[in-house]
Amino acid sequence: MRIVKGDKVKYLDLEGVVISNPYMYITDMENYIDVYFSKVKETMTLKINDLEKVD
């Protein structure tokens, strides 16, 4: 399932923390995605495999 901007995602390495509606910038379509965390006002580059979509 493809993750797109505005999706709620769960970052699996952070004990399943739900990131609500992050701003995402694709860096490398296959492997990496930049996610802006509004709570900590920080952009992190994460592996797409470490993210899980939340309904």
Regions from the PLM with identified roles:
Residues 1-55:
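Basic/aromatic-rich interaction segments and small domains that mediate binding to polyanionic partners
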